[in-house]
Amino acid sequence: MRHRCRVPKLGRPADQRDALIRTLTTELLRHGRISTTLARAKVIRSEADRMITLAKDGSLAARRQASGFLYDPELVQSVFAAAQERYGSRRGGYTRILRTVARRGDNSPMAIIELV
């Protein structure tokens, strides 16, 4: 039974939520840091860490799994090429969330998520 296994809904249906998480994770890995809401940053932190862990593994199965999640095939190649020397000694915690000022229109808490 999956009692108390809650998924942050982010105010969207499941298919839109999955697409949003994939898009934000792809952009985070491409640019290194993005600004988004705090709730979205907390959700994509785990997905970005999972992609970097797959890149550190470097196997063909891990590469195929990452290319099925990320939208950009060239990004998969660059992440897998740079992950071993950048995060080789680190055992997790590849991202950092910095809280910023609230958004002006609706006062939602904003954050900057960046790769360490």
Curated annotation (Swiss-Prot):
* Record keywords, A-Z: Ribonucleoprotein, Ribosomal protein
**Family the UniProt entry places it in:** Belongs to the bacterial ribosomal protein bL17 family.
Q: Which organism is it from?
A: Gloeobacter violaceus (strain ATCC 29082 / PCC 7421)
Q: Name one GO cellular component term.
A: cytosolic large ribosomal subunit
GO biological process: one example: translation
Instruction: Supply the PROSITE patterns for this chain.
Output: RIBOSOMAL_L17 (PS01167)
Query: Which GO-annotated molecular functions does the record name?
Result: structural constituent of ribosome
* NCBIfam families, sorted: L17 (TIGR00059)
The protein's superkingdom reads: Bacteria
Q: Which InterPro entries match?
A: Ribosomal_bL17, Ribosomal_bL17_CS, Ribosomal_bL17_sf
- Kindly indicate whether the keyword Membrane belongs to this entry: no
Keyword Cytoplasm assigned: no
A Pfam family in this protein?
A: Ribosomal_L17
Gene encoding it? Answer: rplQ
Q: What assembly does the database describe for this protein?
A: Part of the 50S ribosomal subunit. Contacts protein L32.
Protein name in the entry: Large ribosomal subunit protein bL17
